[in-house]
Each structure stands twice: as C-alpha cells, then as structure tokens.
C-alpha cells in the first residue's frame, strides 16, 4: 500500500506578495494581469475570491467583480526561490517527489521512517516546517493513491490537511462529484452530465463499453477513478511538455462556422488548465487539432509565447483546409511548454484524522 502526500501551497503567489508587502494583507489582491490590457490573473488571495475572482480570469472582468482589487505584477524569480526552499523541506522526508508546479507536488512517503512511518504526521511536520522557514501556509492531502491525495488537499484549505485512509475509499468515492477528478474539466463534466453522470457511483453503474466508446482512453481512466483506483507511480522531476483540451463532438460537424462555435469553451478551459497546472511555465507554441470522420487527424501549430485567441482561430482555418469534405468528430487546442528549470535548479490537524498506521 502506497502512502502519498499531495502538498498544495495556499494562494502561493499572492501569499508571497502579502508576506513581503504587509500593507497588502487583508486587502483583495491578484497576481498578474493589468487593467489596461487583456491580461489574465495567475492567482488571487481569499479576500478576492469572496468577490468571485478566480485564477485564469481576465483582469478586466475581475475588476468589475471587485473594483477595489489590487493587481500585483508577478515576480517569478522570487517564487522560484521560495519554491526551492519548499522543495528542500520535502527532501528531508523522501526522494520520491513529483512537482506539478512551483506550488504543489506529490510525495511518496511509503518507505519513509520519519514520524514512525505515519504519512499523516509527516504531512503535519512538513507543513509546520514550511511555515517556519518561509512564513507561508500549505495544505495537504494524504491517501493511498495520487488523485485522492490531490482531492484531499483541497478539503481542509487553507492551512489544513485531510486523510483518506484505505478503508475510507469505497464510501468516499461514491458521492464524489466527477468534476473533482483531476482531468475532468467543465467541457468533459458537461458531456458526462448530458449522459446523466454526475458522481463516481453514476460511473460505476454505467455500462463500461459505452463509456469507453464515448470517451476513449479517458473513459477507462474514469472507470478506474470511480472505484478509487490510480495505478500511476510518483514520477520524480516530472516535466509535462504540453497542456491541452479536446472534445469529441456528439455529431460530426462540417463547416468552419460550426468549429468556431466550439472554440470559445475549449480556449477558456485551456486557460484554466494552464493556470492550474502550468502557470509557472513559459508557453512556446499553440496547436489546433482536428480528427475527421475517418479517424485520421491533423494538427497545425505556430510558435507563440502567450495564449492568443486570434492565433487559435487562424490555426483552425489552416487546419480546415485539410478537411477535404470530411466530417469533423473531434476538435482540440493545446499549448506547448518550454523546458522548466524547477527540477534542475533544486535549488491545525483534526486529531480524529491521525493514525500512526497511515
């Protein structure tokens, strides 16, 4: 049985800014974006979230929701330095560390002898050391598998932790909303809802062949996750090369106008995914993908250092030149990510949740 800890810093970029500039504390702030440009917010503090401000939101819209919102320019080098401090804390407990971004990581502590082998106590100690050494709070989730540890880290935020023990998994996943499963965004969640699928128990009762037929490989993943299964191991120094979103259409479409109508939701979801899992990474290209009725596919890409909506539409037009009157069954957008230096730089707990066995 694995013991996985998912550590997620609380409002990381915003928290660093409030630590370094105390006059910002207690005020709604957001990092990134500018009021005079179509910028996008990287993250915001809890005061801003009370007004509905969220990551990946256009800064102009965020200011409409919260007129007193303070927009703070990002300081990526500072965030990387703090991230290295946090990484050093992780390394005291395990070498099996899978960074997801500057502010979150998976830790496999299965073989660690710290804290009498208790992942629960190790998570508590890690959070305490991060607070003492950086002045920042972290939340943590503890579970036997990765995706449940990630979900658990969000259940007692901020500055808390939650444990899903092996014997809790079956009951926990029954009522788990599918939108909570990593990889299920708004687009996929709507498709599932259209089939009457809202929770993991709904997936468990749904015919597996139909789910795989509708969602392909991800259908198989959903079946496993609905049962609390996640066979993925921790990948030390993992570095993803791209982030993408695609949708398999209910019916084939044939015109550029029909494709353009699908794009806004895909681009919005892509922006949200980049903000969640790759906000510290530089973008190096944009890609549009089409899969036709004969299951052949084509991709068009172009170099870009930021997400440009106009460029996505230009790439779509170029891809459509390869249609040759075939129906289109899938449409996708993605961005390539430049190599990161994170890996190379190296640079209150509920007592009822404590269990020395886990």
Curated annotation (Swiss-Prot):
Gene from which the chain derives: dinB
Keyword Metal-binding: yes
Reactions accelerated catalytically: DNA(n) + a 2'-deoxyribonucleoside 5'-triphosphate = DNA(n+1) + diphosphate
Cited function: Poorly processive, error-prone DNA polymerase involved in untargeted mutagenesis. Copies undamaged DNA at stalled replication forks, which arise in vivo from mismatched or misaligned primer ends. These misaligned primers can be extended by PolIV. Exhibits no 3'-5' exonuclease (proofreading) activity. May be involved in translesional synthesis, in conjunction with the beta clamp from PolIII.
Catalytic residues in the record: 104
Species whose genome carries this gene: Shewanella halifaxensis (strain HAW-EB4)
Localization in the cell: Cytoplasm
A biological-process GO annotation: error-prone translesion synthesis
Protein's name in the database: DNA polymerase IV
Cellular component aspect of the GO annotation: cytosol
Cofactor(s) named in the record: Mg(2+)
């Amino acid at each position: 049985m694995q013991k996985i800890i998912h550590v997620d810093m609380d409002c990381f970029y915003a928290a660093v800014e409030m630590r370094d500039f105390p006059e910002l504390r207690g005020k709604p702030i957001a990092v990134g974006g500018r009021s005079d440009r179509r910028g996008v917010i990287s993250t915001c503090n809890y005061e801003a979230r009370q007004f509905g401000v969220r990551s990946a939101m256009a800064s102009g819209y965020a200011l409409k929701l919260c007129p007193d919102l303070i927009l703070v320019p990002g300081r990526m080098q500072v965030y990387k330095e703090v991230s290295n401090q946090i990484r050093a804390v992780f390394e005291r407990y395990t070498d099996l560390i899978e960074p997801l971004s500057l502010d979150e990581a998976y830790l496999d502590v299965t073989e660690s002898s710290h804290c009498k082998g208790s992942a629960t106590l190790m998570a508590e100690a890690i959070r305490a050391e991060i607070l003492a050494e950086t002045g920042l709070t972290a939340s943590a989730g503890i579970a036997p598998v990765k995706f449940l540890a990630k979900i658990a880290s969000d259940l007692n935020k901020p500055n808390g932790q939650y444990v899903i023990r092996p014997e809790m998994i079956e009951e926990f996943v029954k009522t788990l909303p599918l939108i909570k499963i990593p990889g299920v965004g708004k687009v996929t969640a709507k498709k599932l809802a259209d089939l009457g699928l809202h929770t993991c128990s709904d997936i468990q009762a749904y015919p597996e062949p139909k789910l795989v037929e509708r969602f392909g490989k991800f259908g198989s993943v959903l079946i496993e996750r609905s049962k609390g299964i996640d066979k993925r191991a921790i990948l030390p120094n993992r570095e993803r090369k791209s982030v993408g979103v695609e949708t398999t259409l209910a019916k084939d479409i044939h015109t550029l106008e029909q494709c353009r109508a699908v794009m806004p939701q895909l681009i919005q979801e892509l922006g949200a995914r980049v903000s969640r899992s790759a906000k510290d990474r530089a973008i190096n290209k944009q890609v549009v993908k089409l899969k036709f009725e004969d299951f052949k596919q084509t991709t068009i890409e172009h170099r870009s250092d930021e997400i440009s909506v106009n460029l996505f539409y230009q790439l779509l037009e170029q891809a459509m030149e390869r249609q040759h009157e075939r129906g289109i069954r899938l449409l996708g957008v993605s961005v390539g990510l430049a190599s990161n230096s994170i890996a190379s730089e190296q640079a209150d707990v509920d007592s009822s949740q404590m269990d020395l066995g886990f």
